[in-house]
Regions:
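Residues at structural and domain junctions
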Residues: 8, 25-29, 70
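Pan-zinc metallopeptidase signature
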Residues: 80-164
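Active-site scaffold of zinc-dependent metalloenzymes
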Residues: 1-11
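Active-site recognition of the HExxH zinc-binding catalytic motif
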Residues: 13-29
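Post-HExxH zinc-binding segment in Zn-dependent metallohydrolases
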Residues: 30-71
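Juxtamembrane "helix exit" motif at the C-terminal ends of alpha-helical transmembrane segments
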Residues: 68-85
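Context-gated lysine
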Residues: 7, 47, 58, 144-145, ...
Length: 164
């Protein structure tokens, strides 16, 4: 239909939007996740969407972030002495997002060091598994690979590709 024929719709191109939604479809087996928008946003060309997209997984997160940032100078200009307190909400959102990014970065590094291509494996993990993988050593990951059919399948399907 017309969706595919328009180059851009509300700032998004059709191919990017469809790829984004396909990633959501791939993760439907998992319960609500703190990474609901992280994986779909990784396909976007815009760095901002790749980096900040996960903030939009829940409606209240961008409201807390942007609302707090917008309200603070207004309250300061109005002479309210507690204007700085309103910045606590944006700081909490930023700190939580930083923590989530650090966990997924650690999990990706651990998987890469153990010989896995990290993004396809992480896409197929629940939050609990991602958090656990972020804390595992190479030896612990090797033990999982040796004892778990699921991890063996990860190793078979998603090894790090070596250049020839």
């Amino acid at each position: 239909g017309s969706f595919m024929h328009r180059k851009r719709r509300m700032g998004y191109d059709a191919a990017e939007t469809l790829a984004h939604e396909l990633v959501h479809a791939a993760r439907t087996a998992f319960p609500d996740s703190v990474y609901d928008e992280f994986f779909p946003c990784q396909i976007h060309q815009a760095k901002f969407r790749r980096y900040a997209g996960n903030i939009f997984r829940k409606w209240y997160l961008p409201m807390m972030l942007l609302g707090g940032i917008a309200a603070a100078p207004v309250l300061a200009a109005a002479g309210c002495s507690f204007w700085g307190v309103i910045l606590i909400a944006p700081l909490i959102v930023i700190a939580r997002e930083f923590q989530l990014r650090q966990r997924i970065r650690n999990a990706a590094d651990n998987l890469r060091n153990a010989g896995f291509d990290p993004m396809p494996v992480l896409l197929r993990m629940s939050d609990r598994e991602i958090f656990e993988t972020a804390t595992l050593t190479r030896e612990q990951l090797a033990a999982k690979k040796a004892s778990s059919p699921r991890w063996q399948q990860f190793a078979d399907c998603f090894p790090i590709k070596t250049e020839l």
